[in-house]
């Protein structure tokens, strides 16, 4: 042998050498080759004979080591010989004689076989080509419990696991038939063999208990076609001789750790909580999808008429515990998961809580390895399952098993659920919440592949593995292929768990032999999940074992009914509409979980489910349950709706609410959510009756979620009242939406409550989609919707309660600067809802509210009234506090001066204007109009609405007009995200009243920026512009200085009961604290600067354009309607900057001018501009610029008497209502033309004028600063002592707490004044083309308003001089009374009155206009910044004003520089504002009016036109 072995090795070199010489094959080489082949063959056979150890045989899978084989052979031969010698020596001779007949054999032939089998620890069997067991050794009983007789002549497939059929077939068939791959005669493979059930199992079957099939993993060493047998005859030519032994434990693949999650169900089987902590900790890929699919599968499978989940739940309730059979489902990546649910009935001994069912769901991902927990894989549905666990391709080559084969073969291993069985006994009662979770193809995967699911098949012979009919609920993925054996087993019921649908037919597997291991790689798994749109939330599983893609069931193998069912279910799954499946009513609720909710559940399951384990978790869940009870008390009382949305079931909703609450806390929504919960609970209990809830539900379910879903605050609750529908459903939808809603996504637009509007409503059934609805914003323009007051009969009380108890908290929350956008969204919702509610009230009801508010004449009452403005929430919620002053309910006229308290019937005219806005309650002056939900305003409606609303309140028409400002078409949009409600309430002193709503408007200066105005309409337009322009001009039909306090008082229509002074002050202080504290407010007011700088502050007011910017953002301090205008006047350029037309130009005298133009800005100080310097500046500017009339047509401001000469009374002119778009267009054209023509001229003139004005202003400012400092100090003291009940000047100075930030409601006077575009702006009038806006005499109503508000004719001569200067040009426009009043108050004198004409009806003449004007101006000014000439002029002018009030100092010249484009407006406005401010306190009302007029002319232009002008300036 040695030479023979060595010869080939030596022959190789010879061959290589000869190959060069010999090209053709030689006989010698052929002989050598044959010898080598034969030698290798003999060595192989020798190895098979010598090596009895299977492990050694396995080692032969690779090329055997010849030397090792020969060595072992020699060794064994020697051992045998030595053994024989020893035995012979020990035996007696007699014995030798006795045994001589046996020859020399050491072991008897009969005993050799059993001994060998015992040594091998296995049994021996022979299978012919047909798969029948020809022979089996007797010791098979030790392994499979079957007797030899039972298995003889039976099909081997009856005891083989379905998943191993294909593997066995590959070994049985001749190698020519198996993939054409040659194979050794002997080979080893693994398979699972059925263990005969115990007798106990038989008895259980009779009891209806399905036995769990048990499989034993066996390792088979097979020899096919042995030559010795083949030679003897043909019978056994193709037989397979096998020795089977148990797979050693050490050799068995370690199954991946099982995954589990717990659910908690109520007595109806509805899932109340879900805990996925353990799964989340494992972070295996697709665990969320696994949870969803598990719950879906468990609830979707039916056994006859009852679902398995329901049957399981009933068993738990009956016995206290239950264990479900194994069921299977597939993940999106094709991984088969075997699941089992164990539930126990838990009773709490520590409290009276009702018992609940705790369920533990144990999940095992099937591996593609044959030996892996085969019982787990196979147990799921009995033998019907086709677990493709064996890694060998043979599994995939599955051949059809005999139909008679028992499909219930169970693996020897019971599917062990991690944790005690008690825990396993989780109630599988419908998992409502989770049932809806991502109804993906999990149902498809549900086809049970595990055999553990006992299919009442007694013996393997019993029946075909196939199911006779498709399982009604089993959703077989098209990839799943049913084993032929399983296909028609008559024994197996079509139970949802029946593996039949899921069985993998060996044949089908053969076709997909290469696919059994699909996605074994974790990365592949993740990729597929991603490709299928179900990206794994967790990192992909590291163990590919569980992902065996054995579930390759082809639909072709399924029964037609199964396919049909699959199709229907799959379609449902795709939509996540399990609720529609024919589950029990409760089942539907469980499965009704929406996909979105499922996502939420997936995210929140861990948090919620954490509490589900053990009774201790019950205690943990108490808080959540209480919260649910709190929020859903009414819903619990109501019967569940039958609508699909109700399929979720109350528990579903509750669980969702819990999830939402949990997730919110996790997402840092906790604080706002708590407030929401409180509000919701209170609203639901106090304000919503079943009828109201039904209405809400009707809206929600009928078509779209109403704004209730959009609104996060009590307003949403109000919405609930208004909306009719099934109360329970709606309520749940609303609660869930509110709880789940992301505050950050809320916008005033979302909040603007058009309760009656179905389009704004979200269908509760779409609650899972609420997240999308949340994000969605309502259109800035809302159609006018009138809501009957009957719906809001209880609204007043509710709102009062909310205001007194909760609004302050909400406001304080919303007033945080950083979070103001989010919180203000809530506040906006609340206020808008309240506003709509109030609008829904009859006029008489609103009047009553106004009266109530008026009765509370104190600042607190005003504050309450402002709170009452909640009804005004139709306005952008930026104007939250604007609504505080009932003025918000009225057209938002900023005309109401801080001190002007004279109610004016003229307001009604504005109110009528507001009526045009839609839902304007003309009957209830101001309030109604304001309260009415803002419809999408037409371009011309914005300004007009504000003006119309403003006069609504006879006593506080101005304030009301302000509200309209807020209500500008963008009312639906939050005017200013940063605006804070509470501080505004504090500002409700007379000045505060004007200023509070005004300030709110101003503070939220960027309202318009935030507002979603039509593209052609500058955002600032809608709310603030109106407010800014009109207030100061009586001619505009809005009370220029109608008592702000009165207006505010009227505005609080929403809150019937006046808020207690203490409460209001507390709220205000809370808001102030939120705003960085009183010190911040002081700094904003400029009090420290005033004290330290003295007159320098006055100069700052002029010099600092920042105040304008502040105004643009949200001048919080514009208590005075004119304060904003003053700001604009000073920083008139800056207001131009802010597209929102914040302050037209702050006058140094207006503390408000320091108001923050942008939501994030705060007024640096409240310094009143000196009217004298301002007047001079304005006069110079106006004269130099030839009083350009471009602004007048734009503004349509009756107040446009910007160039007011001291001796000349300005007459307000009203323009006919002009569309905002038209105004914007015209303004843009005018501005562009004017800018082009006058840029250079104006720049030069402005520079000269600015120098002169600066000198004059410095002198005037010094005087004014002294007065203003005194006033401001006094106001600061008042504000601190009275909770920001600051004098108008203080308010105007921007010292008002940011709480006033809440966007002012643009007060557009009803009147639209056709002033020249430059009217009151000091900008040279544009060419005649601007004549369309040529000033039109104010309508009598506007005049009456302006007169009444201005009616004190208290204007100083200086103011009159200013008015005169302007009046020369604009004199006819401006009413003498108005002039006087306008200049009466230094601060308010400058307060901007939104130009009704420009702003439209929404630009009442309330000083609050300034915010809008500020916005508009700021936007306009910003836009106008495009004009460098104006910019320089603005800069020069602003620089001239630096000595002005500190508030204005904040409005630093750089702002003017920024507002270069707006310079012509700003310069004019600022001049006007300055001149108006020059009058000082004596000018309070007139100053405000004139200031506003000046500002309004400027501001009005920006207000109605500037918003649009702003863009044009940009274009210029």
UniProtKB/Swiss-Prot annotation:
Residues 116-180 form the PAS domain. One of its GO terms (biological process) is positive regulation of transcription by RNA polymerase II. A motif (LXXLL motif 2) lies at residues 680-684. Residues 1324-1340 have a biased composition (Pro residues). Keywords: Activator, Biological rhythms, Developmental protein, Nucleus, Repeat, Transcription, Transcription regulation. Expressed homogeneously during late blastula-early gastrula stages, becoming highly expressed in the notochord in the late gastrula and neurula stages. At hatching, restricted to a few areas including the blood precursor region, prospective pronephros and retina. SUPFAM superfamilies: HLH, helix-loop-helix DNA-binding domain, Nuclear receptor coactivator interlocking domain, PYP-like sensor domain (PAS domain). Residues 1-37, 386-406, 457-518, 532-601, 700-727, 775-795, 955-979, 1284-1311, 1324-1350 are annotated as: Disordered. PROSITE patterns: BHLH, PAS. Contains three Leu-Xaa-Xaa-Leu-Leu (LXXLL) motifs. The LXXLL motifs are essential for the association with nuclear receptors and, at least in part, functionally redundant. This is Nuclear receptor coactivator 2. The lineage of its organism: Eukaryota, Metazoa, Chordata, Craniata, Vertebrata.
């Amino acid at each position: 042998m040695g030479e023979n072995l060595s010869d080939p090795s030596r022959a190789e070199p010879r061959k290589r050498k000869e190959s060069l010489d010999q090209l053709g094959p030689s006989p010698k080489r052929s002989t050598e080759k044959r010898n080598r082949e034969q030698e290798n063959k003999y060595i192989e056979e020798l190895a098979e004979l010598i090596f009895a150890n299977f492990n050694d045989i396995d080692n032969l899978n690779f090329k055997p080591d010849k030397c090792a084989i020969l060595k072992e052979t020699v060794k064994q031969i020697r051992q045998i010989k030595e053994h024989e010698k020893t035995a012979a020596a020990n035996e007696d001779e007699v014995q030798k004689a006795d045994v001589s007949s046996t020859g020399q054999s050491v072991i008897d032939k009969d005993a050799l076989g059993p001994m060998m089998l015992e040594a091998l620890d296995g049994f021996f069997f022979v299978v012919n080509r047909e798969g029948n067991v020809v022979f089996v050794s007797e010791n098979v009983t030790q392994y499979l419990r079957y007797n030899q007789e039972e298995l003889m002549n039976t099909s081997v497939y009856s005891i083989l696991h379905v998943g191993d059929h294909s593997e066995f077939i590959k070994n049985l068939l001749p190698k020519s038939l198996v993939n054409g791959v040659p194979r050794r005669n002997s080979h080893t493979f693994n398979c699972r063999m059925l263990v005969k059930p115990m007798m106990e199992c038989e008895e259980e079957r009779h009891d209806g208990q399905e036995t769990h099939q048990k499989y034993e993993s066996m390792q088979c060493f097979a020899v096919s076609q042995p030559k010795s047998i083949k030679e003897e005859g043909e019978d056994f030519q193709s037989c397979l001789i096998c020795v089977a032994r148990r797979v050693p434990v050490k050799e068995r693949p370690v199954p991946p750790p099982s995954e589990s999650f717990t659910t908690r169900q109520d007595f109806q089987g509805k899932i109340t909580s879900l805990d996925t902590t353990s799964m989340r900790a494992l972070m295996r890929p697709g665990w969320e999808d696994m949870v969803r699919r598990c719950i879906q599968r468990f609830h979707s499978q039916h056994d006859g008429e009852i679902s398995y989940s329901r049957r399981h739940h009933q068993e738990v309730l009956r016995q206290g515990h239950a264990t479900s059979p194994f069921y299977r489902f597939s993940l999106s990546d094709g991984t088969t998961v075997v699941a089992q649910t164990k539930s126990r009935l838990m009773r709490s001994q520590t409290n009276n809580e009702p018992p609940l069912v705790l369920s533990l769901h144990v999940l095992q991902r099937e591996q593609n390895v044959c030996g892996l927990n085969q019982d787990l894989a196979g147990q799921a549905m009995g033998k019907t399952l086709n677990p493709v666990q064996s890694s060998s391709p043979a599994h995939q080559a599955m051949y059809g098993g005999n139909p008679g084969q028992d499909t219930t073969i169970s693996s020897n291993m019971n599917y062990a659920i991690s944790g005690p069985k008690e825990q396993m006994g989780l109630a599988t009662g419908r998992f409502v919440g989770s049932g809806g979770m991502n109804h993906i193809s999990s149902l498809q995967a549900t086809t049970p592949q595990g055999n553990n699911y006992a299919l009442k098949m007694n013996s393997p012979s019993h029946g075909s593995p196939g199911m006779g009919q498709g399982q009604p609920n089993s959703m077989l993925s098209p990839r799943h292929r049913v084993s032929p054996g399983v296909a028609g087993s008559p024994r197996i019921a079509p139970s949802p768990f029946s593996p039949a649908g899921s069985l993998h037919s060996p044949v089908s597997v053969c076709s997909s032999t290469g696919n059994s291991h699909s996605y074994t790689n974790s990365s592949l798994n993740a990729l597929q999940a991603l490709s299928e749109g179900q990206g794994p939330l967790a990192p992909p599983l590291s163990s590919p074992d569980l992902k065996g893609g054995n579930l390759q069931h082809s639909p072709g193998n399924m029964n037609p009914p199964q396919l049909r069912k699959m199709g229907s279910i799959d379609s449902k799954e795709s939509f996540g509409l399990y609720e529609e499946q024919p589950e029990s009513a409760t089942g539907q609720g469980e499965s009704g979980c929406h996909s979105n909710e499922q996502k939420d559940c997936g995210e929140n399951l861990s948090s919620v489910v954490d509490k589900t384990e053990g009774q201790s978790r019950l205690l943990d869940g108490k808080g959540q349950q209480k919260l649910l009870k709190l929020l859903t008390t009414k819903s619990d009382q109501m019967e569940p709706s039958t609508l699909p949305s109700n399929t979720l079931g109350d528990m579903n909703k509750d669980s969702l609410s819990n999830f939402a609450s949990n997730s919110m806390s996790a997402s840092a929504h906790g604080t706002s959510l708590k407030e929401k919960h409180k509000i919701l609970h209170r609203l639901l209990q106090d304000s919503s009756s079943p009828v109201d809830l039904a209405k809400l539900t009707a809206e929600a379910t009928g078509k779209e979620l109403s704004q209730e879903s959009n609104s996060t605050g009590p307003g949403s609750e109000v919405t609930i009242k208004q909306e009719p529908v099934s109360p329970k459903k709606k309520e749940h939808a609303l609660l869930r939406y509110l709880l789940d809603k992301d505050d950050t996504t809320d916008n005033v637009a979302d909040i603007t409550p058009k309760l009656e509007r179905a389009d704004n409503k979200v269908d509760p059934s779409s609650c899972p989609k609420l997240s999308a609805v949340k994000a969605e914003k309502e259109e800035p323009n809302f159609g006018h919707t009138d809501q009957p007051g009957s719906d809001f009969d209880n609204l007043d009380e509710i709102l009062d309660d909310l205001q007194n108890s909760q609004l302050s908290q909400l406001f304080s929350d919303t007033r945080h600067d950083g979070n103001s956008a989010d919180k203000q969204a809530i506040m906006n919702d609340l206020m808008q809802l309240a506003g709509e509610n109030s609008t829904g009230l009859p006029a008489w009801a609103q009047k009553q509210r106004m009266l109530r508010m008026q009765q509370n004449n104190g600042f607190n009452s005003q504050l309450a009234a402002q709170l009452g403005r909640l009804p005004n929430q139709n306005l952008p919620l930026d104007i939250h506090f604007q609504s505080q002053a009932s003025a918000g309910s009225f057209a938002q006229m900023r005309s109401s001066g801080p001190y002007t308290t004279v109610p004016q019937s003229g307001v009604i005219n504005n109110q009528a204007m507001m009526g045009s806005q839609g839902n304007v309650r003309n009957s209830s002056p101001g309030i109604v109009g304001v309260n009415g939900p803002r419809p999408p305003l037409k371009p011309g409606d914005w300004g007009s609405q504000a003006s119309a609303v403003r006069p609504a309140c006879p006593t506080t028409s101005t304030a009301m007009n302000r509200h309209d400002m807020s209500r500008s078409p963008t009312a639906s949009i939050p005017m200013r995200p940063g605006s804070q409600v509470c501080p505004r309430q504090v500002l409700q002193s007379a000045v505060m009243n004007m200023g509070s709503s005004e300030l709110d408007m101003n503070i939220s200066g960027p309202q318009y920026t935030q507002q979603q105005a039509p593209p052609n309409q500058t955002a600032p337009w809608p709310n603030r512009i109106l407010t800014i322009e009109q207030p100061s001009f009586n001619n505009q039909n809005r009370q220029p200085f109608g008592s702000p306090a009165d207006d505010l008082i009227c505005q609080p229509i929403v809150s019937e009961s006046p808020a207690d002074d203490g409460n209001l002050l507390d709220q205000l202080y809370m808001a102030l604290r939120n705003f960085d504290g009183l010190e911040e407010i002081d700094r904003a007011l400029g009090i420290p600067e005033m004290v330290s700088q003295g007159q320098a502050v006055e100069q700052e007011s002029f010099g600092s354009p920042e105040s304008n910017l502040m105004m643009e953002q949200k001048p919080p301090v514009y208590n005075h309607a004119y304060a904003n205008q003053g700001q604009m006047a000073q920083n008139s350029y800056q207001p131009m900057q802010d597209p929102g037309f914040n302050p037209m130009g702050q006058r140094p005298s207006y503390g408000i001018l320091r108001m923050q133009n942008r939501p994030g800005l705060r007024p640096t100080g409240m310094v009143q501009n000196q009217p004298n310097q301002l007047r001079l500046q304005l006069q110079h500017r106006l004269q130099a610029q030839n009083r350009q009339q471009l602004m007048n047509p734009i503004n349509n401001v009756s107040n446009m008497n910007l160039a007011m000469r001291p001796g000349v009374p300005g007459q307000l002119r009203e323009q006919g209502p002009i569309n905002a778009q038209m105004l914007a267009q015209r303004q843009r054209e005018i501005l562009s033309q004017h800018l082009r023509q006058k840029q250079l001229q104006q720049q030069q003139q402005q520079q000269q004028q600015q120098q002169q004005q600066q000198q004059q202003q410095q002198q005037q400012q010094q005087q004014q600063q002294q007065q203003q400092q005194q006033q401001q100090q006094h106001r600061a003291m008042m504000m601190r002592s009275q909770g920001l009940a600051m004098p108008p000047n203080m308010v105007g100075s921007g010292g008002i707490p940011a709480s006033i930030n809440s966007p002012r409601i643009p007060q557009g006077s009803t009147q639209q004044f056709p002033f020249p575009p430059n009217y009151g702006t000091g900008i040279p009038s544009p060419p005649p083309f601007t004549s369309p806006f040529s000033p039109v005499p104010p309508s009598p109503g506007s005049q009456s308003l302006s007169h009444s508000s201005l009616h004190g004719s208290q204007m100083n001569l200086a103011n009159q001089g200013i008015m005169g200067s302007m009046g020369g040009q604009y004199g006819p426009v401006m009413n003498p009374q108005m002039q006087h009043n306008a200049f009466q108050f230094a601060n308010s004198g400058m307060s901007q009155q939104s130009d009704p004409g420009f702003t439209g009806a929404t630009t009442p003449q309330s000083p609050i206009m300034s915010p809008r004007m500020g916005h508009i101006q700021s936007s306009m000014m910003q836009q106008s910044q495009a004009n460098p000439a104006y910019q320089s002029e603005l800069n020069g002018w602003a620089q001239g004003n630096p000595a002005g009030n500190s508030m204005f100092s904040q409005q630093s010249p750089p702002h003017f520089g920024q507002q270069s484009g707006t310079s012509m407006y700003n310069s004019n406005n600022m001049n006007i504002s300055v001149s108006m401010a020059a009058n000082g306190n004596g000018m309070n009302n007139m100053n405000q009016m004139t200031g506003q007029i000046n500002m309004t002319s400027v501001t009005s232009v920006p207000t109605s036109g500037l918003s649009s002008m702003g863009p044009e300036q940009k274009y210029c």
